[in-house]
Amino acid sequence: MNILQQLEQEQVAKLTAGKTIPAFSPGDTVRVNVKVVEGTRERVQAYEGVVIARKNAGLNSSFTVRKISYGEGVERVFPLYSPRIDSVELVRKGDVRRAKLYYLRGRTGKSARIAERTTGHGITKKDTGSEG
């Protein structure tokens, strides 16, 4: 491993020390809590939407979240290891077959829906106890 990769890994470890980032992929619905500075005050604002892209590039990793706000599509790109991101919560897993969901930009209503994934990678089954 060269020295640049080692430095980058140390930076990622330092930035993720206080928070846990769940494993999410395109198609998943996430709630990103972002620290917003307004004058002298700082507050946390929630941004919930569908992940339409994920760029895995070490320290420069980012993800794009799309939501519909007052009938208008809004996309926001978040750096994964940004100190402005307070937390990321996984709301639901989506069942998609693409890595980039840019085609959702041209769709509205029912055609823009994503089916929920209930089994497979990243899904943990809850034990309901013994039946019978």
Curated annotation (Swiss-Prot):
- Keywords on this record? Ribonucleoprotein, Ribosomal protein
- Give the record's family classification: Belongs to the bacterial ribosomal protein bL19 family.
Q: Which PANTHER family does the annotation name?
A: LARGE RIBOSOMAL SUBUNIT PROTEIN BL19M, RIBOSOMAL PROTEIN L19
One biological-process term from Gene Ontology? Answer: translation
Enumerate the GO terms in the molecular function aspect: structural constituent of ribosome
Annotated GO CC locations: cytosolic large ribosomal subunit
The record's annotation in SUPFAM superfamilies points to:
Translation proteins SH3-like domain
Protein purpose:
This protein is located at the 30S-50S ribosomal subunit interface and may play a role in the structure and function of the aminoacyl-tRNA binding site.
* HAMAP family per record: Ribosomal_bL19
Q: What is this protein called?
A: Large ribosomal subunit protein bL19
